[in-house]
């Protein structure tokens, strides 16, 4: 069988050189596209491909090539020798006909351009994302001294703000550029928008320069509070503990986007009650009583608008409280009783006996709840759970 194939293959290249010479003797356009000389495998596979295609007319050309390559690999050197010699003769003939021939690969440049195009798009996306975060955080100082619960956010904020804005963004998301799957791309875009919003709130809070004015920005960016307050308390008003915990009623479950939506939906309605709540809060001397008042009002009325107004109209300078710790101060039942009696719908003033009785019952339930929970972070833990049972009043 191999002798027959060798005969056909050895005779067919004898017909090929006139074709090549005729092609070379044609017009100049055909001379520009000169094919390379066949190697030994091509010399052998040309006849074999024709034969296999006739035997299997439905077989694809790629499958034929796979089978031919597998057969060529298992052939011995003695069986390949005549085809190797024929390939050498064809190469010598090709060099004689085209002495100045130089192989110029054309498809390789196209694939390289395609890869460069994709890498360029990924680089532009990388630079745009990192540059946006760097611009958003550079006025805010990159979140300087945040600590505690906001450690991960601080790490995300400091890497763009410290000058590595274009280099550190891929490490924030955890994905390389251009490598997002379909569903992950939406999540990454949402995370990018959320971090940009964090950066904007950071810039707005740092820009006025006064630590006491920062509550005016919080109703618009509520998901920033737990990470931002630990470095505001020691600088502007170190002794009162409650301004740090006053905003945590809306963020019952701290998921950044839903908490922000519920709080932002409640904050526009809060401006109507601004004057009344501000006058009521000016009469109260202790910031802890204002915080408890906010919790009781939100729980008893069932609306977050009063809480939003209290947050909006918090006085910028709070009176110092002697010996108050930042996190571990126990709740004050007397203040809670007074403020609940003020905000109850039945009477409003502390002198009303019915309101006083209801306030005493509510305060007892609240204090029992408060003392049953760990005291280590009262703003988010006890401030939420203590006011939830008051809704039945």
UniProtKB/Swiss-Prot annotation:
One of its GO terms (molecular function) is RNA polymerase II cis-regulatory region sequence-specific DNA binding. Residues 213-234 have a biased composition (Basic residues). Residues 197-208 have a biased composition (Low complexity). One of its GO terms (cellular component) is nucleus. Expressed in the animal hemisphere at early cleavage stages and in the presumptive ectoderm in the late blastula embryo. At gastrula stage (stage 10.5), expressed weakly in the anterior ectoderm distant from the blastopore. At neural plate stages (stage 13), expression appears in the anterior neural plate. At neural fold stage (stage 20), strongly expressed in the anterior of the neural tube. At stages 23 and 25, expression increases in the presumptive brain and appears in the optic vesicle. At tail bud stages, strongly expressed in the brain, eye and weakly in the spinal cord. It is found in: Nucleus. It holds the Pfam family HMG_box. The 9aaTAD motif is a transactivation domain present in a large number of yeast and animal transcription factors. A motif (9aaTAD) lies at residues 338-346. Induction: By bmp-antagonism. Residues 375-393 have a biased composition (Polar residues). This is Transcription factor Sox-1. It comes from the Eukaryota. Gene3D superfamilies: High mobility group box domain. SUPFAM superfamilies: HMG-box.
